[in-house]
Amino acid sequence: MGKKVLLTGFDPFGGETVNPSWEAVKRLNGEEAEGVSIAAEQIPTVFHHSAAVLKKAIEKHKPDVVICAGQAGGRAHITPERIAINIDDARIPDNEDREPIDEPIAADGPAAYWSALPIKLIVKELRKNGIPASVSNSAGTFVCNHLFYQLMHRIDRTSANIRGGFIHIPFLPEQTIDKPEPSLSLETIVEGLRIAAVISALHEKDIRETGGSIS
């Protein structure tokens, strides 16, 4: 039986009219590639509500792998995240105008969780296909990191036979018309997430080689 991957993307936030994570993952919904089936769901950019929506999506699709994607304006690469940390520290309000400062995500949780995705292998395969990619060592402290941490905390506490992680993606070109930020085309992002989904489903173990960045 083939593997199933659940991809999630966020709704727009911070004054943007689109969110590239949702624009990309919704184009992969229902696809099959190399025996891997892909489903996609949208997550609200809301601290207190995002994990509940993800929980329902996991219960609905019963995936083998969950990859949450999010927008990281200012980054030039597709960046699989290495670690989720147990803190909310918002620089801007979320989409329900909540702005938690220095608040733990889970009072009974560990300081951090490692990604369970083969992040170095994903980077290698993306680069092999001409897609700029690098490992990120910080998912920030906004809703992206919050969801990443909640995903891994849920997997840990329920002993679910699921592997999960998070991937940040750059702005789309239309988002950078009025700001000097890097971007990637939607087609490139879609292909990058397709590759990441297949690699994550077919490979549980990562490789050990350079794939990160200085910061």
From Swiss-Prot:
Q: Which residue positions are annotated as catalytic?
A: E81, C144, H168
- What chemistry does it catalyse, as a reaction equation? Release of an N-terminal pyroglutamyl group from a polypeptide, the second amino acid generally not being Pro
Q: Where in the cell is it found?
A: Cytoplasm
Q: Entry's PROSITE patterns? A: PYRASE_CYS, PYRASE_GLU
Q: What is its EC number?
A: 3.4.19.3
Q: Which GO terms describe its cellular component?
A: cytosol
Q: Which Pfam family name is an example for this entry?
A: Peptidase_C15
Q: Which GO terms describe its molecular function?
A: pyroglutamyl-peptidase activity
Domain of life according to the entry: Bacteria
Q: Which InterPro entries match?
A: Peptidase_C15, Peptidase_C15-like, Peptidase_C15-like_sf, PGP-I_bact-type, PGPEP1_Cys_AS, PGPEP1_Glu_AS
Q: Which GO terms describe its biological process?
A: proteolysis
Keywords on this record?
A: Cytoplasm, Hydrolase, Protease, Thiol protease
NCBIfam families recorded for this chain?
A: PRK13197.1, pyro_pdase
Quaternary data = Homotetramer.
| Similarity annotation | Belongs to the peptidase C15 family.
Role this protein plays: Removes 5-oxoproline from various penultimate amino acid residues except L-proline.
Q: What is the protein's given name? A: Pyrrolidone-carboxylate peptidase
Q: Which organism is it from?
A: Bacillus licheniformis (strain ATCC 14580 / DSM 13 / JCM 2505 / CCUG 7422 / NBRC 12200 / NCIMB 9375 / NCTC 10341 / NRRL NRS-1264 / Gibson 46)
